[in-house]
From Swiss-Prot:
Placement of Solcar repeats on the sequence: 11-102, 111-201, 210-295
Topological region Mitochondrial matrix: 33-73, 134-178, 233-266
Gene Ontology molecular-function annotations: cardiolipin binding; long-chain fatty acid binding; oxidative phosphorylation uncoupler activity; purine ribonucleotide binding
Protein name stated in the entry: Mitochondrial brown fat uncoupling protein 1
Localisation per UniProt entry: Mitochondrion inner membrane
Family that this chain belongs to: Belongs to the mitochondrial carrier (TC 2.A.29) family.
Keyword ATP-binding: no
Disulfide topology: none
Binding site for fatty acid 16:0: K56, K269
Tissue: Brown adipose tissue.
TM ranges: 11-32, 74-96, 117-133, 179-195, 213-232, 267-289
């Protein structure tokens, strides 16, 4: 992101995909409790979790979960989350530069905003379709409660895949693809384009060098913009994916039920943990991604020089 100078090593597509996958997995492991808190806040009010448990704020939700269901609950669904990043983030982030270059091929000028958005749309759309089953399982495991004699729907990650496919249908593993596609198209375009533009502005105007402080600031700004614009689609996606069979006939029905029963603010439930999670996830992921790309490219150049 931001074209390297002629003196810099151009990372290959394989290096970008691998770096994105590893960086995203690391970011997920560190920020996963925030994601679990976000999911619980987003589904609060629809009646599946006992009304005696109320989650208030980020720290309140994390503390309540730890006290009532145990610390491991904060990481329930992590294996599916890691699988999601391997199949999803590695593609949407790792392929972004390559697809952007394809749309800009034959032009001497830097990629236009249209090129960047087109690349974000394409990589985000493909990644969502491939990674959707992991998203469904992750959300289901994060949402299920063990309180007050409620029997868990799933005992683990692979049990969840099997139960969903056999008791609901194989296609249920792609449940919520539409709102998730909308959410991730927004995220991919806003996150990657904002990060790219912010980083380019800082580097090209010589405000910051293309190094860790620049990556930190760019990632933080991208995280805020992305969270604000993607929140409504994110809440609807979580509600629809976690819903029982027949609870919502369609995605629009889910959105309308939320609007009529809980009001427009329901679309921003879990905004604070969502922002904290996405901003911190972005910072960790982009910093690790940039450093991994550099180091792997240098290693590759060293190997090439010695052979």
């Amino acid at each position: 992101m931001v074209n390297p100078t002629t003196s810099e090593v151009h990372p290959t597509m394989g290096v970008k995909i691998f770096s994105a996958g590893v960086a995203a997995c690391l970011a997920d492991i560190i920020t996963f409790p925030l994601d679990t808190a976000k999911v619980r806040l987003q589904i609060q009010g629809e009646g599946q979790i006992s009304s005696t448990i109320r989650y208030k704020g980020v720290l309140g939700t994390i503390t309540t979960l730890a006290k009532t269901e145990g610390l491991p609950k904060l990481y329930s669904g992590l294996p599916a989350g890691i699988q999601r990043q391997i199949s999803f983030a590695s593609l949407r982030i790792g392929l972004y530069d390559t697809v952007q270059e394809y749309f800009s091929s034959g032009k001497e000028t830097p990629p236009t905003l249209g090129n960047r958005i087109s690349a974000g749309l394409m990589t985000g759309g493909v990644a969502v379709f491939i990674g959707q089953p992991t998203e469904v399982v992750k959300v289901r495991l994060q949402a299920q409660s063990h309180l007050h004699g409620i029997k868990p729907r799933y005992t683990g990650t692979y049990n969840a895949y099997r139960i969903i496919a056999t008791t609901e249908s194989f296609s249920t593993l792609w449940k919520g693809t539409t709102p998730n596609l909308l959410r991730n198209v927004i995220i991919n375009c806003v996150e990657l384009v904002t990060y790219d533009l912010m980083k380019g502005a800082l580097v090209n105007n010589q405000i910051l060098a293309d190094d860790v402080p620049c990556h930190l600031l760019s990632a933080f700004v991208a995280g805020f913009c992305t969270t604000f614009l993607a929140s409504p689609a994110d809440v609807v996606k979580t509600r629809f994916i976690n819903s029982l069979p027949g609870q919502y006939p369609s995605v629009p029905s889910c959105a309308m039920t939320m609007l009529t029963k809980e009001g427009p603010t329901a679309f921003f439930k879990g905004f604070v943990p969502s922002f904290l999670r996405l901003a911190s996830w972005n910072v960790i992921m982009f910093v690790c991604f940039e450093q991994l790309k550099k180091e792997l490219s240098k290693s590759r150049q060293t190997v090439d020089c010695t052979t």
